[in-house]
Every structure is written in structure tokens, then in C-alpha cells.
Amino acid sequence: MVREFELSVAAVHRIVKKAGAERVSESAASELARILEEVGVDIAREALYFTLHAGRKTVRAKDVKAAYEKLFKFKRPYWFES
């Protein structure tokens, strides 16, 4: 069964290669695409919560950042540029 992802498998291949891999199997790229999509939906869902709580209809970058930090309990280092 071939599954369509929001992220292309080719893009995921490039991401894994950026991480230093010389070669990436199709199944590894597909699995990472599935996981990234799942994590992305979780972040988007949490960002929507922040948006609605603020009385807005538009999800903003600050909502996504806050959702990411809440879900992953990670504060970006001061040198991280957004």
C-alpha cells in the first residue's frame, strides 16, 4: 500500500542526508515522513489551542513556537534564530 504524505519522500531524503546520512532507504524516508507528519499535526493542534485561547482565528508563528515548546519542553537557545 502506497501512502501519500504532506511531506514528499524526496524532501525527507534530503533532510536525512542533511543530517549526515550517505544513503537513505525508501522505507526509512517513508517512515520519517509519517512521523514528521504526525508530530506536525500534534504541534498544529496545540497551536490552534493557543490561537483560540487568545480569541483569534489565525494561527500565528508565536502559537506554533509556543506549541512546540510546550509539547517538547524545550526552550530554544538564545542563539536560535526563527
In which residue ranges do the predicted regions lie?
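Histone-fold and other basic nucleic-acid-binding segments
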Residues: 1-82
